[in-house]
């Protein structure tokens, strides 16, 4: 029953203001804080009752089928309880020095490793508006990047201002330089802009793309969205 609505760009900038701000000790605390604060702020602005509800990034809506991505391990879920919350995340400009290579003598990793993270966030180089996304990384080789260093590296894009394609290309190039893999595929699925998907993919071969994300290159296949999209 509001006579007004919130202008879209201002709403994006408003929710961006929660970035880099400690809202609680646990994910549940953070979501409740944002729910309560945003509900209060927007209700006051529009002079009506508005309810805001945040959901975990990895939730899949009923009926959604994220094609070929159930084989990926989500980085945020890989660590032991408490390990992620105690991790020092202090670099917010892209830094390849964060990446650490490990030789997997213990056999923890398979020859082909697939990582997913919903923590990718950068900013538009023209408007500075926030761009949130999911990154999917698949590579085959004898060297591996440590999960902790990869997560820190993904987070390091948060203050960068680049187009989606540049972010994807940078991640691909950095990993290719340090791992020298036989196959590498990096896919960045971003929150839609004006209803338009901008989902760059960079890979060592068309074969790698066909394996990891066939729905993105087949014009006869409907691309399945992520929860963010």
PLM feature spans:
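N-terminal intrinsically disordered, cationic/polar leader segments
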Residues: 1-229
